[in-house]
Swiss-Prot record:
Residues 47-69 are annotated as: Disordered. Forms a complex with TatC. GO terms for cellular component: TAT protein transport complex. This is Sec-independent protein translocase protein TatA. Belongs to the TatA/E family. The chain crosses the membrane at residues 1-21. It comes from Chlorobium chlorochromatii (strain CaD3). InterPro entries: TatA/B/E, TatA/E. It comes from the Bacteria. Part of the twin-arginine translocation (Tat) system that transports large folded proteins containing a characteristic twin-arginine motif in their signal peptide across membranes. TatA could form the protein-conducting channel of the Tat system. NCBIfam families: tatAE (TIGR01411). Residues 47-63 have a biased composition (Basic and acidic residues). Coiled coil: none annotated. Pfam families: TatA_B_E.
Amino acid sequence: MFGLGGQELVLILLIVLLLFGAQKLPELAKGLGKGMKEFKRAQNEIEEEFNKSMDDNPKKEKATTASKS
């Protein structure tokens, strides 16, 4: 994960604990989780919209070709 080992992750967690305190950590984790969830939801929506437009595109081309014949 990002080229970090176990010792580096523990050190980062200790620094975060010192900076924000034990009281704020659950709030920070909750906010981070919500942000990641929202990002994934938006990413999925964009992907679905892209796939839908790609699926509709050949149908439009076939309809245009058929009407020209």
